[in-house]
């Protein structure tokens, strides 16, 4: 647990650095020279929809994110989901070309979370068919402690959740990329002893480019364990999302339809309580805006323009 808190502290220190000039997201995910032969821009953002993609921020780049999910579009009493929308604000930072960290706060269940993403392998034209990354995250639910029977104690550890993922992606062409995400989500507290504290899931996500700046995306998480898990007595379902990515200069705008209102891995992978089959769908969007905090050495030396 101590290591996880150190991770959150490190993420916060980098995320609160002073902002420098804005730069185009195209530079962040720009194609490398052909002789490098490494695949780039497998996805145009560090998230496919809810879940992480294999993309990393460049060294010294800060990404300010606003993730927003409306309530159930069939909920007339809450003005078709507008009145009970949820939002998450996040700051991600590229420490090196292969390491990035992030810290966020979400309205849904008043949740704070942090993560680290490490790029392990890069897809190349020969020798390496896929890009592989690791993502480790933890979240803290800060809602008030529930009322308990006399003699029972509410522990701080009940608020903690952990996620470990391996991201395996392949860019088949400039127009098509696919990613699979073996995942384990650990819940320190579950509704009943009949449920495991570990939810194992397999995610799959993809991107189809339809124009220079627009792509269609999809994401699905199948739970191998805890498929019948209850959350506050409610049935849970596998998370399914479809979306559109629109790249406009310094930011990527992601518009989606999903049955998951939660935005962290804890919520959308294992605790989605809405179903597409029942028409419980949420409209949502992500906005990503990047800022260059530290210029690469070659640009500081006048060998290029950032």
Model feature map: region roles:
Residues 1-5:
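Positively charged n-region of N-terminal signal peptides that target proteins for export
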Residues 180-225:
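A mid-sequence, solvent-exposed acidic-amphipathic segment
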Residues 6-7, 174:
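General helical structural elements
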């Amino acid at each position: 647990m101590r290591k996880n808190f150190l991770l959150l502290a490190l993420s916060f220190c980098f995320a609160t650095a002073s902002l420098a000039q804005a730069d185009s997201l195209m530079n962040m995910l720009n194609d490398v020279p052909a002789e490098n032969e490494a695949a780039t821009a497998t996805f145009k953002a560090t998230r496919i929809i809810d879940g992480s993609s294999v993309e990393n921020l460049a060294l010294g780049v800060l990404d300010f994110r606003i993730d927003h999910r409306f309530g159930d579009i069939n909920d007339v009493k809450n003005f078709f989901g507008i009145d009970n929308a949820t939002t998450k604000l996040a700051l991600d930072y590229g420490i090196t070309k292969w390491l990035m960290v992030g810290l966020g706060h979400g309205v849904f269940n008043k949740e704070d979370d942090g993560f680290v993403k490490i790029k392990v392998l890069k897809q190349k034209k020969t020798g390496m068919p896929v890009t592989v990354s690791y993502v480790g995250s933890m979240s803290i639910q800060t809602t008030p402690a529930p009322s308990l029977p006399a003699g029972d104690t509410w522990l701080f550890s009940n608020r903690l959740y952990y996620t470990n993922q391996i991201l395996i992606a392949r860019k088949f062409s400039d127009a098509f990329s696919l990613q699979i995400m073996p995942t384990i989500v650990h819940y320190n507290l579950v509704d009943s002893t009949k449920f495991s504290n570990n939810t194992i899931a397999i995610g799959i996500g993809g991107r189809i480019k339809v124009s220079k700046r627009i792509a269609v995306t999809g994401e699905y998480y199948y739970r191998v364990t805890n498929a019948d898990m209850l959350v506050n007595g409610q049935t849970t379902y596998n998370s399914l999302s479809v979306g559109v990515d629109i790249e406009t200069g310094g930011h990527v705008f992601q518009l989606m339809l999903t049955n998951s209102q939660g935005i962290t891995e804890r919520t959308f992978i294992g605790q989605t309580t809405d179903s597409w089959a029942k028409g419980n769908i949420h409209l949502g969007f992500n906005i990503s805006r990047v800022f260059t905090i530290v210029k690469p050495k070659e640009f500081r030396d006048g060998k290029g323009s950032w």
